[in-house]
């Protein structure tokens, strides 16, 4: 089973809110996920609000989960990918 770290959209029209989840690559965007890793709120006034459980993200990366481009950018901004590369 190929696992991806990706965003699941929540919120109302023109007011998105996302969960960062580990999901089967074949599942639909807002479909079944395996585990929630964090949240991403791009609508915050000053800057996008990101909350990530670092241990869960590192666990999934170690197990071979591939992040999507957007999640890759979020993880690198938070410094999680640097920690993952240092552990290799």
Swiss-Prot record:
GO terms for cellular component: cytoplasm; small ribosomal subunit. One of its GO terms (biological process) is translation. HAMAP family: Ribosomal_bS16 (MF_00385). SUPFAM superfamilies: Ribosomal protein S16. Pfam families: Ribosomal_S16 (PF00886). The gene is rpsP. One of its GO terms (molecular function) is structural constituent of ribosome. Keywords: Ribonucleoprotein, Ribosomal protein. It comes from the Bacteria. Belongs to the bacterial ribosomal protein bS16 family. Signal peptide: none annotated. NCBIfam families: S16. The keyword GTP-binding does not apply. This is Small ribosomal subunit protein bS16.
């Amino acid at each position: 089973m190929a696992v991806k770290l990706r965003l699941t959209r929540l919120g109302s029209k023109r007011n998105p809110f996302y969960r960062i989840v580990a999901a089967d690559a074949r599942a639909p965007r807002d479909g079944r996920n395996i585990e929630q890793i964090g949240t991403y709120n791009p609508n915050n006034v000053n800057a996008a609000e990101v909350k990530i459980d670092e241990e869960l993200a590192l666990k999934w990366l170690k197990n071979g989960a591939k992040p999507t481009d957007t999640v890759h950018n979020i993880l690198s901004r938070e410094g999680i990918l640097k920690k993952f590369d240092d552990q290799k």
